């Protein structure tokens, strides 16, 4: 057997709300790579909404989510996937506990998360999700594939600002946190080939030094470095590890599901954030947190923020 891991992020650019980095880990037959996994599971998983039919869609979150389209397809894919791991979330907090439990410990420091909860899923009928999980389970079993993990790293504003300062740039921080998350899943695996596919981090083409920092026991070999993809390999013959950083990596199923997990948790975080401020500032319009609108929102809440003595450090991401 071999292992496929994919990572992707959501919330890299906003000033409000957390950065989400997610990874998914799969066990596959030796001859199935990241590019082939969609085809291998095509009877139960679709890569686009266009021809999905009754199948579960797993794709770049930007292709299946928009404010108008809603959370339905994110929830269908995530609930079916989490069902393979023994999770059946019924509330907002259940979702965090299943995918990013460490985030729950940080939430009491931010008033918009204190005591917040809501039913989940919010865009799907629960009755339709159990059959999806069962269908996915049967499809994975027939293909000799197992989903082993869906894990997210949540970087809230205060930690985000600190890590950017420590690393010297937002891009370097993203790369290091992504590789740390990937390593946390890889290090527990038994012998077997491990292929990791990561969406490229902005304009970065060179990741060798960062991989050497994270996997310091091994000599990292550079196989390709360019604008479209960068490939590295290391480790002993019985546990060879490959990292491929590439543009449009969501065409690989493990990355697509990671993209969906990151986007969904980001939307859940902003749901609580907006609910808090809208309850306290009359006529306030919600925000997605991106720079231009974030400045409008920040000005609109300034008086209430001051009255509530909420420090900018837990609210505003500097970059």
Predicted segments with their positions:
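RNase H-like, Mg2+-dependent phosphodiesterase core
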Residues: 1-319
């Amino acid at each position: 057997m071999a292992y496929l891991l994919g990572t992707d992020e959501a919330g890299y650019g906003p000033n409000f709300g957390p950065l989400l980095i997610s990874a998914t880990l799969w066990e596959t037959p030796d001859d199935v790579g990241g590019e082939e996994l969609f085809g291998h599971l095509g009877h139960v998983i679709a890569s686009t909404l266009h021809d999905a039919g009754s199948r579960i869609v797993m794709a770049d979150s930007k292709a299946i989510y928009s404010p108008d389209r809603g959370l339905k397809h994110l929830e269908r894919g995530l609930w079916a996937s989490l069902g393979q791991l023994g999770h059946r979330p019924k509330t907002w907090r259940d979702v965090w506990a299943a995918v990013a439990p460490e985030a729950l410990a940080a939430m009491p420091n931010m008033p918009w998360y204190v005591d917040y909860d809501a039913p989940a899923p919010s865009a799907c009928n629960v009755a339709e999700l159990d059959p999806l999980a069962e269908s996915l389970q049967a499809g994975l079993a027939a293909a000799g594939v197992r989903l082993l993990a869906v894990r997210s790293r949540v970087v809230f504003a205060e930690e985000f600002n600190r890590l950017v300062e420590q690393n010297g740039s937002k891009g370097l921080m993203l790369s290091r946190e992504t590789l740390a998350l990937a390593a946390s899943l890889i290090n527990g695996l038994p012998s077997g080939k491990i292929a990791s596919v990561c969406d490229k981090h902005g304009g970065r083409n060179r990741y060798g030094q960062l991989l050497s920092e994270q996997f310091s026991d091994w000599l990292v070999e550079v196989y390709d470095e360019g604008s479209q993809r960068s490939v590295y390999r290391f480790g002993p013959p019985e546990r060879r590890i490959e990292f491929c950083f590439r543009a449009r990596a969501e065409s690989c199923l493990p990355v697509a599901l990671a993209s969906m997990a990151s986007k969904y948790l980001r939307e859940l975080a902003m749901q609580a954030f907006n609910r808090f401020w809208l309850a306290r500032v009359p006529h306030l319009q919600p925000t997605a947190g991106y720079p231009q609108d974030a400045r409008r929102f920040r000005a609109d809440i300034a008086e209430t923020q001051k009255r509530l003595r909420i420090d900018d450090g837990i609210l505003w991401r500097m970059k």
